[in-house]
Protein backbone atom coordinates (compact mmCIF):
# COMPACT_ATOMS: atom_id res chain seq x y z
CA UNK A 1 0.00 0.00 0.00
CA UNK A 2 1.29 3.45 -0.97
CA UNK A 3 0.17 6.66 0.74
CA UNK A 4 1.05 10.26 -0.10
CA UNK A 5 0.60 13.08 2.42
CA UNK A 6 0.43 16.39 0.57
CA UNK A 7 -0.08 20.10 1.04
CA UNK A 8 1.02 20.48 4.65
CA UNK A 9 3.94 22.27 6.22
CA UNK A 10 6.64 19.60 6.42
CA UNK A 11 9.24 19.33 9.18
CA UNK A 12 11.76 16.68 8.16
CA UNK A 13 13.63 16.53 11.47
CA UNK A 14 16.94 16.94 9.66
CA UNK A 15 17.63 20.45 10.94
CA UNK A 16 16.38 22.28 7.86
CA UNK A 17 13.68 24.94 7.80
CA UNK A 18 10.03 23.82 7.56
CA UNK A 19 8.88 23.19 3.99
CA UNK A 20 5.68 25.16 3.25
CA UNK A 21 4.19 22.73 0.72
CA UNK A 22 5.63 19.33 1.46
CA UNK A 23 4.94 15.81 0.29
CA UNK A 24 5.62 12.54 2.09
CA UNK A 25 5.33 9.22 0.27
CA UNK A 26 4.92 6.09 2.40
CA UNK A 27 5.27 2.62 0.88
CA UNK A 28 4.14 -0.11 3.24
CA UNK A 29 5.52 0.84 6.63
CA UNK A 30 8.45 2.88 5.32
CA UNK A 31 8.86 6.53 4.29
CA UNK A 32 10.02 6.35 0.68
CA UNK A 33 10.41 10.07 0.03
CA UNK A 34 9.87 13.42 1.74
CA UNK A 35 10.48 16.97 0.60
CA UNK A 36 9.02 19.88 -1.36
CA UNK A 37 6.06 18.95 -3.54
CA UNK A 38 8.05 19.98 -6.60
CA UNK A 39 10.76 17.42 -5.80
CA UNK A 40 8.68 14.41 -4.71
CA UNK A 41 6.58 12.71 -7.38
CA UNK A 42 3.42 10.98 -6.22
CA UNK A 43 2.99 7.39 -7.46
CA UNK A 44 -0.13 6.88 -9.54
CA UNK A 45 -1.42 4.15 -7.21
CA UNK A 46 -1.03 6.22 -4.03
CA UNK A 47 -3.86 7.00 -1.64
CA UNK A 48 -3.61 10.74 -1.02
CA UNK A 49 -4.13 12.53 2.28
CA UNK A 50 -4.58 16.30 2.01
CA UNK A 51 -2.73 17.89 4.94
CA UNK A 52 -3.34 21.50 3.87
CA UNK A 53 -3.45 23.76 6.91
CA UNK A 54 -1.63 21.20 9.04
CA UNK A 55 1.96 20.38 9.94
CA UNK A 56 3.51 17.01 9.11
CA UNK A 57 6.53 15.87 11.11
CA UNK A 58 8.31 12.66 12.14
CA UNK A 59 6.98 10.64 15.05
CA UNK A 60 8.02 11.90 18.47
CA UNK A 61 9.99 9.94 21.06
CA UNK A 62 8.83 10.12 24.69
CA UNK A 63 11.72 9.13 26.92
CA UNK A 64 9.67 8.58 30.08
CA UNK A 65 6.17 7.10 30.14
CA UNK A 66 4.15 4.93 32.52
CA UNK A 67 1.55 3.32 30.30
CA UNK A 68 -0.12 1.44 33.13
CA UNK A 69 -0.58 4.37 35.53
CA UNK A 70 -3.95 6.09 35.25
CA UNK A 71 -5.85 6.69 38.49
CA UNK A 72 -4.40 7.98 41.76
CA UNK A 73 -7.52 6.72 43.56
CA UNK A 74 -6.09 3.97 45.80
CA UNK A 75 -9.53 2.65 46.78
CA UNK A 76 -10.51 2.26 43.14
CA UNK A 77 -7.16 0.67 42.37
CA UNK A 78 -7.79 -1.99 44.99
CA UNK A 79 -11.28 -2.66 43.66
CA UNK A 80 -10.12 -3.15 40.07
CA UNK A 81 -9.09 -6.60 38.88
CA UNK A 82 -5.63 -6.93 37.30
CA UNK A 83 -7.21 -7.77 33.94
CA UNK A 84 -9.29 -4.57 34.06
CA UNK A 85 -6.20 -2.47 34.74
CA UNK A 86 -4.35 -4.15 31.87
CA UNK A 87 -7.20 -3.50 29.45
CA UNK A 88 -7.44 0.10 30.61
CA UNK A 89 -3.73 0.47 29.96
CA UNK A 90 -4.22 -0.38 26.29
CA UNK A 91 -6.32 2.79 26.02
CA UNK A 92 -3.44 4.84 27.44
CA UNK A 93 -1.06 3.25 24.96
CA UNK A 94 -3.37 4.02 22.05
CA UNK A 95 -3.78 7.63 23.23
CA UNK A 96 0.01 7.95 23.38
CA UNK A 97 0.29 6.95 19.73
CA UNK A 98 -2.55 9.32 18.80
CA UNK A 99 -0.50 12.18 20.30
CA UNK A 100 2.17 11.55 17.66
CA UNK A 101 4.51 9.54 19.88
CA UNK A 102 5.77 6.59 17.87
CA UNK A 103 8.53 5.42 20.24
CA UNK A 104 8.63 5.49 24.03
CA UNK A 105 10.65 4.33 27.01
CA UNK A 106 8.24 2.54 29.36
CA UNK A 107 9.73 3.22 32.77
CA UNK A 108 8.01 0.50 34.86
CA UNK A 109 4.63 -1.14 35.02
CA UNK A 110 4.39 -2.82 31.62
CA UNK A 111 5.83 -6.27 31.09
CA UNK A 112 7.07 -7.74 27.82
CA UNK A 113 3.55 -8.68 26.75
CA UNK A 114 2.66 -5.04 26.15
CA UNK A 115 5.64 -4.58 23.85
CA UNK A 116 4.99 -7.79 21.95
CA UNK A 117 1.26 -7.06 21.54
CA UNK A 118 2.15 -3.75 19.87
CA UNK A 119 4.85 -5.32 17.70
CA UNK A 120 2.44 -8.01 16.50
CA UNK A 121 -0.36 -5.53 15.79
CA UNK A 122 -2.73 -6.79 18.49
CA UNK A 123 -3.06 -3.26 19.87
CA UNK A 124 -2.06 0.09 18.35
CA UNK A 125 0.76 1.82 20.15
CA UNK A 126 4.27 3.25 19.95
CA UNK A 127 7.37 1.07 19.82
CA UNK A 128 8.26 0.42 23.45
CA UNK A 129 11.53 0.01 25.29
CA UNK A 130 10.55 -1.45 28.67
CA UNK A 131 12.04 -1.55 32.17
CA UNK A 132 9.29 -3.79 33.65
CA UNK A 133 10.12 -2.97 37.30
CA UNK A 134 11.38 0.06 39.23
CA UNK A 135 13.82 -1.63 41.60
CA UNK A 136 13.79 -0.07 45.07
CA UNK A 137 15.22 -0.53 48.53
CA UNK A 138 12.93 -1.32 51.46
CA UNK A 139 11.11 1.90 52.35
CA UNK A 140 12.21 3.45 49.08
CA UNK A 141 10.30 5.10 46.28
CA UNK A 142 9.23 1.80 44.74
CA UNK A 143 8.22 0.12 48.02
CA UNK A 144 4.45 0.57 48.09
CA UNK A 145 4.04 0.20 51.85
CA UNK A 146 1.26 2.18 53.53
CA UNK A 147 0.89 3.15 57.22
CA UNK A 148 -1.93 0.63 57.66
CA UNK A 149 0.83 -1.97 57.57
CA UNK A 150 0.19 -3.31 54.08
CA UNK A 151 2.12 -3.46 50.85
CA UNK A 152 -0.08 -2.49 47.92
CA UNK A 153 1.24 -3.83 44.62
CA UNK A 154 0.70 -1.14 42.01
CA UNK A 155 0.67 -3.76 39.29
CA UNK A 156 -0.51 -7.19 40.41
CA UNK A 157 0.94 -8.86 37.30
CA UNK A 158 4.49 -7.94 38.35
CA UNK A 159 6.66 -9.28 41.16
CA UNK A 160 7.81 -7.08 44.05
CA UNK A 161 10.44 -4.52 43.02
CA UNK A 162 12.06 -4.41 46.47
CA UNK A 163 15.65 -5.62 46.87
CA UNK A 164 18.25 -4.84 49.53
CA UNK A 165 21.98 -5.43 49.37
CA UNK A 166 24.17 -6.36 46.41
CA UNK A 167 23.06 -9.98 46.06
CA UNK A 168 19.31 -9.29 46.19
CA UNK A 169 19.78 -6.54 43.62
CA UNK A 170 21.85 -8.82 41.42
CA UNK A 171 19.14 -11.49 41.49
CA UNK A 172 16.32 -9.05 40.75
CA UNK A 173 18.23 -7.47 37.86
CA UNK A 174 18.77 -10.94 36.43
CA UNK A 175 15.05 -11.61 36.76
CA UNK A 176 13.90 -8.49 34.90
CA UNK A 177 16.39 -9.12 32.11
CA UNK A 178 15.22 -12.73 31.86
CA UNK A 179 11.64 -11.40 31.67
CA UNK A 180 12.52 -9.32 28.62
CA UNK A 181 13.47 -5.88 29.92
CA UNK A 182 15.26 -3.64 27.43
CA UNK A 183 16.98 -1.80 30.27
CA UNK A 184 17.05 -1.81 34.08
CA UNK A 185 15.52 0.89 36.27
CA UNK A 186 16.35 1.49 39.92
CA UNK A 187 15.65 4.25 42.44
CA UNK A 188 18.55 6.20 43.92
CA UNK A 189 16.38 8.79 45.63
CA UNK A 190 12.92 9.17 47.06
CA UNK A 191 10.01 10.59 45.11
CA UNK A 192 7.32 13.23 45.38
CA UNK A 193 4.55 10.59 45.50
CA UNK A 194 6.21 8.35 48.08
CA UNK A 195 4.57 7.59 51.41
CA UNK A 196 7.68 6.63 53.36
CA UNK A 197 10.45 8.80 51.95
CA UNK A 198 11.35 12.30 50.81
CA UNK A 199 12.18 13.18 47.20
CA UNK A 200 15.66 14.47 48.09
CA UNK A 201 16.94 11.60 50.25
CA UNK A 202 19.50 9.25 48.70
CA UNK A 203 18.67 5.57 48.30
CA UNK A 204 21.01 2.64 47.62
CA UNK A 205 24.75 2.83 48.11
CA UNK A 206 27.16 3.31 45.24
CA UNK A 207 28.15 -0.35 45.63
CA UNK A 208 24.52 -1.49 45.27
CA UNK A 209 23.93 0.71 42.23
CA UNK A 210 27.14 -0.53 40.62
CA UNK A 211 25.98 -4.14 40.98
CA UNK A 212 22.92 -3.28 38.89
CA UNK A 213 25.10 -1.57 36.30
CA UNK A 214 27.49 -4.52 36.08
CA UNK A 215 24.72 -7.13 35.84
CA UNK A 216 22.92 -5.18 33.13
CA UNK A 217 26.19 -4.79 31.23
CA UNK A 218 26.57 -8.57 31.16
CA UNK A 219 23.48 -8.62 28.94
CA UNK A 220 24.46 -5.54 26.97
CA UNK A 221 21.83 -3.42 28.71
CA UNK A 222 21.90 -0.03 30.39
CA UNK A 223 20.59 1.27 33.72
CA UNK A 224 18.22 4.19 34.18
CA UNK A 225 17.75 5.65 37.64
CA UNK A 226 14.91 7.52 39.26
CA UNK A 227 16.91 10.30 40.94
CA UNK A 228 15.43 13.59 42.09
CA UNK A 229 17.75 14.67 44.89
CA UNK A 230 21.35 15.74 44.46
CA UNK A 231 22.86 13.00 46.63
CA UNK A 232 21.01 10.27 44.74
CA UNK A 233 22.14 11.72 41.43
CA UNK A 234 25.78 11.88 42.56
CA UNK A 235 25.73 8.25 43.66
CA UNK A 236 24.20 7.18 40.36
CA UNK A 237 26.82 9.07 38.38
CA UNK A 238 29.62 7.57 40.45
CA UNK A 239 28.23 4.11 39.66
CA UNK A 240 28.26 5.00 35.95
CA UNK A 241 24.56 4.61 35.17
CA UNK A 242 23.31 5.38 31.69
CA UNK A 243 20.51 7.88 32.34
CA UNK A 244 19.13 10.06 35.14
CA UNK A 245 15.35 10.35 35.26
CA UNK A 246 13.94 13.62 36.69
CA UNK A 247 17.24 15.09 37.95
CA UNK A 248 15.74 18.02 39.87
CA UNK A 249 18.99 20.01 40.13
CA UNK A 250 20.86 22.27 37.77
CA UNK A 251 23.35 20.91 35.25
CA UNK A 252 25.87 23.53 36.39
CA UNK A 253 25.63 22.23 39.95
CA UNK A 254 26.19 18.64 38.85
CA UNK A 255 29.11 19.53 36.61
CA UNK A 256 30.79 21.23 39.55
CA UNK A 257 30.76 17.88 41.35
Predicted segments — roles?
Residues 3, 10, 14-57:
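Histidine-rich, glycine-flanked metal-binding segment
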Residues 54-120, 138-144, 207, 239:
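Metal-associated gating/positioning segment near the N- to mid-region
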Residues 124-126, 133, 201-221:
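Alpha-helix-loop-beta-strand connector modules within alpha/beta enzyme cores
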Residues 252-257:
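Conserved small/polar residues in nucleotide/adenosyl-binding loops
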Residues 87-114, 125-134, 181-194, 222, ...:
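Divalent metal-dependent hydrolysis catalytic cores, especially in the metallo-beta-lactamase
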Amino acid sequence: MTTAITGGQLITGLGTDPIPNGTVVIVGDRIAAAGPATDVPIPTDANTIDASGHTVLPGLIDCHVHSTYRARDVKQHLLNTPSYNILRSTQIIEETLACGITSAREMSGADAGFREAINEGLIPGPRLQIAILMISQTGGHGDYWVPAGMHIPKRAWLRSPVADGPEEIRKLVRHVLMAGADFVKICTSGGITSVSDSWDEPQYTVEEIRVAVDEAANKGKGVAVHAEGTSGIKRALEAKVHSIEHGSVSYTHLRAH
